[in-house]
Amino acid sequence: MSLLLPDSGLLFWMFVAFGVVFVILAKYGFPIIIKMVEGRKTYIDQSLEVAREANAQLAHLKEEGEALVAAANKEQGRILKEAMEERDKIVHEARKQAEIAAQKELDAVKQQIQIEKDEAIRDIRRQVAVLSVDIAEKVLRKNLQDKESQMGMIDRMLDEVLTPNKN
């Protein structure tokens, strides 16, 4: 008997034993194994489908998140633009108000200066008039000490008043 080639009787009983085991497995074992493999296949298919759906939902959520971020950035830009426009408007208005207030203050100061100038001129004129009268009085007293010079002065003044101004 060779180790590599079995005898025909041994070969027969090996086929019979194999056939019996195969029939028992085919009748009772394979359906259960096939059922378990099918169940496992169904479970794996369902898991793959759930994973695909989860990936799709994740991609959709990612797109929604990106859209929300883009919308938020756009809104932020709009709000910043409005804030800058409002700031510029407020600054412009404040400058305008400051210019108006400065102009009013300047006008008031100019008016006050003009009033004080007019008052000073009136005061100077009064003082000049008083001084002129005093000087004229002193000059007249000195020049008109006699009656004849007084009468001459009165006549000259009357002539000046009665004749129209030639100047």
UniProtKB/Swiss-Prot annotation:
InterPro entries tied to this protein: ATP_synth_b/b'su_bac/chlpt, ATP_synth_F0_bsu_bac, ATP_synthase_B_chain
Transmembrane intervals: 14-34
Primary localisation category: membrane
Cellular component terms per the entry's GO annotation: plasma membrane; proton-transporting ATP synthase complex
Gene Ontology molecular functions: proton-transporting ATP synthase activity, rotational mechanism
Annotated localization: Cell inner membrane
Pfam families: ATP-synt_B
Keyword Aminoacyl-tRNA synthetase among UniProt keywords: no
CDD domains on file: ATP-synt_Fo_b
Domain of life assignment: Bacteria
Keywords: ATP synthesis, Cell inner membrane, Cell membrane, CF(0), Hydrogen ion transport, Ion transport, Membrane, Transmembrane, Transmembrane helix, Transport
RNA-binding is among the record's keywords: no
Membrane topology: Single-pass membrane protein
PANTHER family reported for this sequence: ATP SYNTHASE SUBUNIT B (PTHR33445:SF1), ATP SYNTHASE SUBUNIT B', CHLOROPLASTIC (PTHR33445)
Biological role stated in the UniProt entry: F(1)F(0) ATP synthase produces ATP from ADP in the presence of a proton or sodium gradient. F-type ATPases consist of two structural domains, F(1) containing the extramembraneous catalytic core and F(0) containing the membrane proton channel, linked together by a central stalk and a peripheral stalk. During catalysis, ATP synthesis in the catalytic domain of F(1) is coupled via a rotary mechanism of the central stalk subunits to proton translocation.
Family, similarity comment: Belongs to the ATPase B chain family.
Complex formation: F-type ATPases have 2 components, F(1) - the catalytic core - and F(0) - the membrane proton channel. F(1) has five subunits: alpha(3), beta(3), gamma(1), delta(1), epsilon(1). F(0) has three main subunits: a(1), b(2) and c(10-14). The alpha and beta chains form an alternating ring which encloses part of the gamma chain. F(1) is attached to F(0) by a central stalk formed by the gamma and epsilon chains, while a peripheral stalk is formed by the delta and b chains.
Protein name: ATP synthase subunit b
Species assigned in the record: Bacteroides thetaiotaomicron (strain ATCC 29148 / DSM 2079 / JCM 5827 / CCUG 10774 / NCTC 10582 / VPI-5482 / E50)
